[in-house]
Design a protein with these regions (language model features):
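Pre-Walker A-like glycine/lysine-rich segment at the N-terminus of P-loop NTPase domains
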Residues: 1-49, 60-70
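Beta-strand secondary-structure signal
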Residues: 5-7, 19, 80-84, 110-112
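Generic "edge-of-domain/loop-turn" microfeature
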Residues: 13, 27, 90-92, 120
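Accessory nucleic-acid engagement/destabilization modules that flank
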Residues: 22-24, 28-31, 50, 93, ...
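Beta-strand elements of well-folded, non-transmembrane domains
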Residues: 24-26, 85-89, 115-117
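Conserved P-loop NTP-binding catalytic core
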Residues: 42-104
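Conserved ATP-dependent motor core of P-loop NTPases, especially the RecA-like helicase ATPase domain
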Residues: 105-130, 136-141
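Conserved small/polar residues in nucleotide/adenosyl-binding loops
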Residues: 145-152
Length: 152
């Protein structure tokens, strides 16, 4: 799995970084002093930190908007970091083993972390194919395919 891009929103002084591409060989963050380079890397680190490090809404949400935005929405479910990962062959095989053949064949997945600490992962899947695979493995699935319709 390889990081291909990330986006930081409503974290410290960064309202929306837009999508930042990560090149396979070298990626540089260039900007003036106090422009948010370290903030971007800090948010990316908190997606999956080595040591227990979570977002603290009161400290990490942009201060000048914290009170106003807090009246309008639940800030604990805001996602300050979102990253896109390209899957390698081993990852695709693991997905196939977990979900069944043909259910998930994404080239990339998107993962994020909310202020409340909840991580989420979006994997595009074919729900119909998943159900067909699950029914094929069930001993009574033959009844669903072979029984005549009530109108016959």
């Amino acid at each position: 799995m390889k990081l291909t891009s990330f986006r930081v929103r409503r974290y410290k002084n960064v309202l929306d970084s837009t999508e930042v591409s990560v090149e396979p060989d070298v990626t540089t963050l260039v900007g003036m002093n106090e422009s948010g380079k370290s903030t971007m890397l800090d948010a990316l680190y908190r997606l999956n930190p080595v040591y227990n490090d979570t977002f603290v809404e009161r400290d990490d949400y942009p201060r000048w908007r914290w009170k106003r935005d807090g009246r309008k929405e639940d800030l604990s479910v805001v996602t300050p970091i979102e990253a896109t990962f390209e899957l390698d062959q081993d990852d695709l095989v693991a997905l196939q083993d977990a979900l069944g053949e043909g259910v998930a064949t994404p080239e990339a997945i998107v993962a994020g972390r909310r202020y409340n600490g909840e991580r989420w992962i979006h994997v595009p899947v074919d729900e119909g194919r998943f159900l067909r695979n699950a029914l094929d493995e069930h001993p009574c699935s033959c009844l669903l395919y072979t029984s005549p319709s009530p109108r016959d």
